[in-house]
């Protein structure tokens, strides 16, 4: 099943300077690992606020949340999970 998550960086709590290049590199490595595992399908930077929109392939919402919680920024309390939305196929493209 696919899910869409939105997260945001907690800059107001930690300050921009806390989001170092080293932390960004650790976050990127974890994202790449989840992509290689087939769990993370696509990732985008949000245009409205610092954070990410991620398309996931997972059994359920609990699995998605566990994957998000494995991110270094989340583990440091620097990332908020705004929403996790289950997605269903759009029937308008199905054969008739």
Stretches with model-predicted labels:
Residues 1-96:
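Conserved, structured core segments of small domains
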